[in-house]
Design a protein with these regions (language model features):
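Conserved beta-loop-beta/alpha segment of the NTase-like Rossmann-fold superfamily
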Residues: 62-134, 140, 166-167
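Catalytic-core segments of class I nucleotidyltransferases/pyrophosphorylases
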Residues: 114, 144-212, 219-222, 226-237
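N-terminal nucleotide-binding beta1-loop-alpha1 segment
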Residues: 1-18
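Conserved beta-strand segments of alpha/beta enzyme cores
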Residues: 24, 67-69, 201-203
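A structural signal for short hydrophobic beta-strand segments in well-ordered beta-sheet cores
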Residues: 25, 136-138, 204
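Conserved N-terminal catalytic core of the sugar/cofactor nucleotidyltransferase
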Residues: 2-5, 27, 31-95
Length: 238
């Protein structure tokens, strides 16, 4: 299994904090966001880690060196991560976890996702419905919709982490190919939403309140800094 971390964007909603530094390299306690995430993947046996970089790509390479692999995406100013992920579609060929680059979470979240069955498994949190991140609708073991769901109909939130096996990768590639012309502002999850709304099986892993945060704004970053000590108590996975 490999991990692909989508880290090409500018993080403009975090300005001025991210004017000269990618948000994945912001500090949470003694580690950067991505130092922590990469360590967590490795602790759970995922050693093939690919960073998709764009904005300030040289800072990532100086920071991580040969610790990870890199692919560069140059059009980060004009597109969202649907196009970022499509630019490395040749990497979607076997078991893979795709992660946003701004996640702070407990080890158990990744562990639960790895253990969850299904060709496509989206990590969601049904313990709350947040306004400023992707919302989902679920029923039993299947995902019904993602992103376009109204708060009233939402079951919870997508946390920015998903797993695909080889068949799931083929389905993802097929779904992205159908929408890649245009849709410059969309996330790759549009392809997942189209699948689920058409009745195709998309599974989900419910982390159900295990601590996680996605950092998109200065307010969210400040809030995570206030509770950073809570992320130091990761549950040990045997």
């Amino acid at each position: 299994m490999k991990a692909i971390i989508l880290a090409a964007g500018k993080g403009s909603r975090l300005y001025p904090v991210t004017l000269n530094k990618p948000k994945g390299l912001l500090k949470i306690g003694n580690e950067t966001i991505l130092d922590r995430l990469i360590r967590q993947f490795r602790d759970l046996g995922i050693n093939d880690i690919l960073l998709v970089v764009g904005f300030k790509k040289e800072i990532f390479k100086d920071h991580f060196g040969d610790e990870v692999r890199y692919r560069e995406y140059g059009n980060f100013d004009n597109t969202n991560n649907l196009h970022t992920l499509w630019s490395i579609n040749d990497e979607l060929n076997n078991d893979v976890i795709i992660s946003f680059a701004d996640l702070v979470l407990h080890d158990e979240v990744i562990y639960k996702l790895i253990q969850s069955p299904g060709e496509i498994v989206m990590a969601v949190d049904t313990s709350q419905v947040l306004k400023n991140t992707m919302r989902v609708e679920v029923d039993n073991d299947r995902l019904l919709s993602i992103k376009t769901t109204t708060i009233k109909n939402s079951s919870g939130n997508f946390i920015g982490l998903a797993k695909f096996n080889s068949k799931g990768c083929k389905r993802l590639l097929s779904g992205m190919k159908k929408i890649i012309n245009g849709n410059y502002d969309d996330y790759y999850t549009l392809a997942i939403d189209n699948m689920s709304r058409s009745g195709k099986m998309v599974n989900y892993c419910d982390i159900n309140g295990i601590l996680w945060r996605e950092i998109d704004t200065k307010y969210e970053y400040d809030e995570v800094l206030k509770i950073s000590h809570l992320f130091n108590n990761d549950k040990k996975i045997d």
